[in-house]
């Protein structure tokens, strides 16, 4: 359960840097660990920054203008990979019950929570939950792909590391089950595409999800280092500010210097919850129920 006294607000970058220094002194953040938060970024001063720091978790949320887009950002460092979890409605794969992200966050006492992939709404990709393979469909999709390999899938292992299975890669069910066992995969997310892999920017002409060539509200999650993560949305927060194609969003993630990054469901689904409150502006100014 989070410590209420560990939450705080900051109104300038210096205050956040002091919190980061405290996390370094406690050895939660390594002395040489490069942080995404940057005091030289074009921070939106009118919006408070929120942070959390205890002996096992650091998180900070802020908003900045990057390449003329308003980005809502969250950087997280945890001491143990088990602190990063996937929450399904009723903790049951396939549950028909839907809830708001704020409700799911409250059920798990989450410091930070984000929406992922609306897994019950689509049949594409590979779904793993609690080390068990639930979805691997070999039916033909568009005549070129199978449903399981029609998109990129993000798989997260017990060490908290990101692993990818890519669109078009041919695998059998047995291959995937062996991969899950060999890499101790805890769960997967099936949306995508991969935005950054091993520090390399990824760009696309076509992808079956996310209307990638349209200006759209975007959301993505990244791994920066060991148990070090970053989440960002680009939303319709100001009528004068454009949103992103997927290639533009990938470029924004790449500018942050992350190791791996993966697109999550955007639009009204793209949501960042900190300490029980929605931090970014959601499309239509209303949460969407998810599974």
Question: Positions of the model-derived regions?
Answer:
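Gly/Ser/Thr/Pro-rich low-complexity, intrinsically disordered segments
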Residues: 1-291
